[in-house]
Regions:
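Feature captures the catalytic ectodomains and active-site-proximal regions of enzymes
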Residues: 1-399
């Protein structure tokens, strides 16, 4: 038996007038997921525990069978694991976005235009981070390039600070959301002076792209300690994701991380490559469990792009779910597959919410026969609800 999770980050949403009162998941053409729903079980699951911020780190830990309330030490330390950062117990790790701020006002009066700087390429971002390193790196502060707009700062023997995610405050004046810590705030203000007229940003502006003109700190935490996935489940696990956060969780859990060329975490990602990596992990490399994480629905939700969010869901269905299921069937391999979001990223608010999300669980050896569509409404109508998301993995593993 092979076990598969396909995670559409932020895929759940609310009914939208632009879609005739349907959610993006309802509006999208998803024959593969509908087939799973027709032959399997649907329900709702609460991946974000009450009182915790609805971040992808918390929600994905839940989906992977970890209770965030007992094992979560911050988002950034998990991301740091994926880029090989060595951490000491008293180090503080920060996520360090390169963001787009307005240019006319004093720093505290600027607004956040884009938390992702137009989904800047990793190559461009690395050039900007090198300028940051040249100005800021020393024995106390170290900066590491991640993927696209997502980077890491380590503050040796530092202290935790209250910080706000930039994607929660798009278009808003930043003053009320800046760090109270004078060191962090000073770095952010100075970063604007370094980055705004950097050659990379001047070229991006000339091409009509958004500048990545400031650092933004958030998601601080300390060195993580996760129970090993194999020790916990008895299974050899594989992670396929473009996002450092998920790769870091996998590293911390002792799972095999697959690097997929062209995996960007956006609509232009290598969908087929990610599906093939999962197929290879399960059918060639001896893995029992594959976790395929698709970031695009979340990014489209943050950007408020309705058509593109629908498209991302259709791509997930036709270019990931369908080929994986087909490959398992062609190989004569019994499998159980769980498809779900980690959290909603509603177009209306352009950030995460803590609401329950719909799941579909299919077992190739126990097919039911009914007509169903994988949607929020139909999943809710089943009356099945898991209030603690981390127990759903045991359901997938039939424990």
């Amino acid at each position: 038996m092979k076990y598969i999770v396909v995670l559409g980050d932020g895929m759940a949403d609310e009914p939208l007038a632009a879609l005739g009162g349907k959610t993006p998941l309802e509006y999208a053409k998803t024959p593969a997921m509908d087939a799973l729903a027709s032959g399997g079980e649907m329900g709702m699951v609460q991946n974000v525990p009450q009182g915790m911020h609805p971040g992808s780190e918390v929600a994905n830990l839940s989906v992977m069978g970890y209770d965030p309330k007992t094992c979560f030490t911050g988002r950034s330390p998990l991301e740091a694991l994926s880029v090989g950062v060595k951490m000491e117990p008293d180090d503080i790790i920060f996520r360090c976005n390169v963001v787009t701020l307005t240019e006319e006002e004093p720093y505290a009066e600027k607004r956040i235009l884009d938390h992702s700087s137009g989904e800047i390429s990793t190559e461009e971002a690395d050039a900007l981070m090198e300028a940051i390193r040249q100005n800021f790196n020393d024995d106390t502060f170290q900066f590491y390039t991640g993927t696209s707009y997502r980077h890491i700062m380590v503050w040796k023997h530092g202290h935790l600070a209250k910080l706000e995610p930039p994607h929660d405050h798009l278009t808003q004046v930043i003053g009320p959301f800046l760090p109270e810590d004078p060191v962090l705030r000073g770095f952010m203000e100075r970063s604007y002076e370094i980055l705004n007229n950097h050659p990379v940003n001047l070229r991006r502006a000339a091409e009509g792209k958004r500048k990545a003109n400031s650092l933004w700190y958030w998601g601080a935490g300390t060195k993580p300690s996760l129970p090993g996935f194999t020790e916990k489940t008895g299974l050899k696990g594989a992670m396929i994701s473009a996002v450092d956060l998920l790769k870091g969780i996998a590293v911390g859990a002792g799972m095999q991380v697959y690097q997929v060329p062209g995996a960007t975490g956006s609509l232009d990602t290598n969908w087929e490559g990610k599906a093939q990596a999962a197929i290879d992990a399960l059918l060639k490399d001896g893995c029992d469990f594959a976790y395929i994480h698709l970031e695009a629905p979340d990014e489209m939700g943050h950007q408020g792009l309705v058509k593109e969010k629908v498209q991302s869901i259709e791509y997930l269905d036709s270019r990931v779910v369908a080929p994986i299921c087909h490959a398992m069937e062609q190989a004569g391999e019994d499998y159980r597959i769980l498809v779900l979001p980690d959290h909603p990223t509603p177009i209306r608010i352009r950030t995460h919410s803590s609401d329950p999300v719909p799941y579909v669980l299919y077992d190739s050896t126990r097919q039911e026969k009914k007509r169903a569509h994988y949607t929020e409404a139909e999943a809710q109508a089943t009356g099945i609800f898991y209030p603690q998301g981390y127990v759903l993995l045991d359901k997938l593993l039939n424990k």
